[in-house]
């Protein structure tokens, strides 16, 4: 029995260690600011959504351990008093307060908090296309933190005609939905850049231009860092 209990204890140590680490990590604060010369409807998953006129800021708290988090701007929206409506880009099921991810195209600020080696991972992604310029800035002064990343190019004005939609620029994956462009199926483990992804990378070198663009597009900060996301700035 003693040996059995010892075996169980050893098996639980890694889980307990991760749990105890998580206790000391607070929720991250995200300040989301609109510096565009037009109104946007900010969206966050988790977090919901809110209308932001130029200069306004929306602050949300995101629990430690959150994965698959993202922030984006919606444009061309109209909502009724109940919070139902539509957006030209970034729409999330017709809801002002988003309960999930939005529709393409949308420029994304993505993150995963308190992950491997007690790090946050963050990036800007054009895998879902582009609608609004964006920057993401950790507030930490830790030298191990990458710092501000941006995608401030006016991609909409330069978008290839076959990817252009009202208010945005689709990615090739969103436009064609093929294994080659989406890095799925036969291309899942052997997926390189295409002329389309090279276009996006040329406009925003720090951003994901396609699904496997990890090497130059993923950044880290120590867990417990807060972040600022700014549209058009």
Swiss-Prot record:
One of the protein's GO biological processes: defense response
Signal peptide: 1-22
Domain of life: Eukaryota
Disulfide bonds listed in the record: 36-232, 77-87, 92-98, 145-221, 151-204, 159-169, 173-182, 183-191
SUPFAM superfamilies per the UniProt record, alphabetical: Osmotin, thaumatin-like protein
InterPro entries xref list: Osmotin/thaumatin-like_sf, Thaumatin, Thaumatin_CS
UniProt note on tissues of expression: Strongly expressed in roots and in female and male strobili, and, to a lower extent, in cotyledons, leaves, stems and pollen grains.
Pfam families referenced in this protein's UniProt entry, alphabetically: Thaumatin
Record: glycosylation sites: 195
Protein name, per record: Pathogenesis-related thaumatin-like protein 3.2
């Amino acid at each position: 029995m003693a040996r059995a209990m010892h075996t169980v204890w050893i098996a639980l140590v890694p889980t307990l260690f991760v749990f105890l680490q998580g206790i000391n990590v607070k929720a991250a604060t995200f300040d989301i600011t609109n510096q565009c010369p037009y109104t946007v409807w900010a969206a966050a998953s988790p977090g919901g959504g809110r209308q932001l006129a130029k200069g306004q800021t929306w602050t949300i708290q995101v629990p430690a351990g959150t994965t698959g988090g993202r922030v984006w701007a919606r444009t061309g929206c109209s909502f009724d008093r109940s919070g139902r409506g539509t957006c030209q880009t970034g729409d999330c099921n017709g809801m002002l307060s988003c309960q999930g991810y939005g529709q393409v195209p949308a420029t994304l600020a993505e993150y995963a908090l308190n992950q491997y080696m007690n790090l946050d991972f963050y990036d800007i992604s054009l895998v879902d296309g582009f609608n609004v310029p964006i920057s993401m800035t950790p507030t930490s002064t830790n030298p191990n933190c990458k710092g501000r990343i941006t995608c401030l190019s006016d991609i909409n004005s330069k978008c290839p005609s076959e990817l252009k939609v009202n208010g945005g620029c689709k990615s090739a994956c969103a436009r064609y939905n093929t294994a080659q462009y989406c890095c799925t199926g036969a291309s899942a483990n052997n997926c390189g850049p295409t002329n389309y992804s090279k276009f996006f990378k040329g406009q925003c070198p720090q951003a994901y231009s396609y699904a496997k663009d990890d090497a130059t597009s993923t950044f880290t900060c120590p867990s417990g860092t807060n972040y600022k996301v700014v549209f058009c700035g």
